[in-house]
A protein has these predicted regions:
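Short, basic/hydrophobic alpha-helical segments
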Residues: 54-66, 150-185
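Acidic, Mg2+-coordinating phosphoryl-transfer loop and its flanking beta/alpha structural elements
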Residues: 172-175, 180-225
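Conserved beta-strand termini and adjacent loop/short-helix elements that scaffold enzyme active sites
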Residues: 74, 160, 215-217
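Conserved GTP-binding G-domain of TRAFAC-class P-loop NTPases and closely related GTPase folds
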Residues: 118-136, 155-163, 184-188, 196-200
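Alpha-helical substrate-recognition element adjacent to the catalytic core
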Residues: 1-147
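Short beta->alpha linker loops
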Residues: 77-79, 152, 194
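Extracellular C-type lectin-like domains
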Residues: 145, 149, 187-188
Length: 225
C-alpha cells in the first residue's frame, strides 16, 4: 500500500501514466482502493486513533479540546461521522497524550456560567461538547471524495465557518444580556492538511475570509501557508 503522505504527492498522477513507486509500477487505483478509509474500516479507525503517532498539529488539537473550543474534523476519509466522534470521545476520556478531560470540563462549566445555562454532570458536559463539534468525512457515502477531496473540503469548511460565526454571535448576545463588557466574540479558525493541494485550494477559496488561517503539515512539519 501507499502511505497517506505519499498518496498526497502522487494522487494527481495515478491513472494518467504508469510510474515507479517502491519497486512497483503504478498504473491506476487498485480495486476498492479506499475500503479501509470508509465504513469498512470504522472499527480499525477507532483502534488506530489510540495508537497512531501524533501529527504536527496535534498540540493545537489538544489545546482546542482542553479549552472547550469548537473544532471540526474535515477529512478525505469516508468513515461514519459517528465513528470519528466516538474515536475522539475515547481520546478525551482516556486523557490521551496531553488531553485533559478535567480541564475541558472546567472550561465547559465556565462557558455555561457565562451563558447563564444550568449545570450538568461531567459526562453530560462532554457529550454535549462532542455534539457541538462538526465531523466531515467527505467520502462518507460516496467514492467521489477519496481521490480528489479538495473541493468537498472547501464546502465543509464553508459550512463550519458559518456555524462557528453563528455560535459566536449567540454567545455575544448572551453576554450582552448579562451586561458583560467583553461580549464581542471574533472567532478564529485554523485549517491544517498534509496535502499541499488541499491547503492551496483552501487558502485560495477563503482568501477574503479573515477568520481562517491555513497551515501545511506536509513532511511532518507545521508551517503557515
Amino acid at each position: 500500500g501507499m502511505s497517506t503522505e505519499d498518496f498526497a504527492e502522487y494522487r494527481t498522477e495515478i491513472g494518467k501514466e504508469p510510474f515507479e513507486y517502491e519497486g512497483h509500477t503504478i498504473t491506476g487505483f487498485a480495486e476498492d482502493a479506499f475500503r479501509y478509509f470508509r465504513t469498512l474500516g470504522d472499527k480499525q479507525f477507532i483502534v488506530d486513533s489510540m495508537t497512531a503517532k501524533p501529527g504536527p498539529a496535534w498540540n493545537d488539537f489538544v489545546e482546542a479540546i482542553n479549552n472547550g473550543s469548537i473544532f471540526s474534523i474535515i477529512t478525505a476519509r469516508g468513515h461514519n461521522p459517528e465513528t470519528i466522534k466516538d474515536a475522539i470521545y475515547n481520546l478525551i476520556i482516556s486523557d490521551h497524550m496531553g488531553i485533559n478531560k478535567d480541564l475541558l470540563i472546567k472550561n465547559l462549566r465556565k462557558f455555561r456560567d457565562l451563558s447563564n445555562m444550568e449545570d450538568k454532570s461531567d459526562m453530560e458536559l462532554i457529550k454535549d461538547y462532542m455534539d457541538m463539534n462538526k465531523y466531515y468525512p467527505v467520502s462518507f457515502g460516496t467514492d467521489a471524495g477519496a481521490a480528489n477531496p479538495e473541493e468537498l473540503k472547501v464546502q465543509a469548511m464553508k459550512e463550519f465557518i458559518s456555524y462557528v460565526k453563528g455560535q459566536a454571535k449567540e454567545m455575544g448576545k448572551k453576554l450582552y444580556v448579562k451586561d458583560d463588557v467583553n461580549n464581542n466574540f471574533v472567532p478564529s479558525i485554523g485549517f491544517s492538511d498534509d496535502d499541499l493541494k488541499n491547503v492551496e485550494v483552501m487558502k485560495k477559496s477563503f482568501k477574503d475570509e479573515p477568520v481562517l488561517k491555513t497551515y501545511s503539515t506536509a513532511g511532518g512539519t507545521k508551517t503557515r501557508y
